[in-house]
Amino acid sequence: MPNLIILVFVGGAFGAMCREFIMLSVPRLADGFPMDIFVANIIAAFLLGLTTSFFKKDKINQYVHLMVGTGIMGGLSTFSSFVFGAVEMMKNPTEVLVSICYLVASLIVGFIAVELGLMIGPKEKPKDPQVASE
């Protein structure tokens, strides 16, 4: 059990460093749209879908899934910053519409990113009907 926690911890630290790199590299747009947080969350959503697909098809073991899926993707994505950014934008009456667009776009594009990750990952092999009937 402690080894699993260490894997998540190390993955989370690496994911947080990746998030900080993205936040330093991706500029905020002039209208206040937090593109840096949006990009980090969408990348994490896609990679979590992909990692989960590999895990479900037994292409990676539980240790890799915990370190990458829970640790790295958990450290990379940032729900608290997502919500905080939206709340801060809503304090400015001229940015309310941008804030709503940010929230909706994050959910829709995040959903699509997870689905793409799952679709790109390994596919389940169809079960052999003769094996099932024996």
Swiss-Prot record:
One of its GO terms (biological process) is fluoride transmembrane transport. InterPro entries: FluC. It catalyses: fluoride(in) = fluoride(out). GO terms for cellular component: plasma membrane. Signal peptide: none annotated. It is found in: Cell inner membrane. GO terms for molecular function: fluoride channel activity; fluoride transmembrane transporter activity; metal ion binding. It holds the Pfam family CRCB. The chain crosses the membrane at residues 4-24, 35-55, 67-87, 100-120. Na(+) is not transported, but it plays an essential structural role and its presence is essential for fluoride channel function. Keywords: Cell inner membrane, Cell membrane, Ion channel, Ion transport, Membrane, Metal-binding, Sodium, Transmembrane, Transmembrane helix, Transport. HAMAP family: FluC. Belongs to the fluoride channel Fluc/FEX (TC 1.A.43) family. This is Fluoride-specific ion channel FluC 2. It comes from Yersinia pestis. The lineage of its organism: Bacteria, Pseudomonadati, Pseudomonadota, Gammaproteobacteria, Enterobacterales.
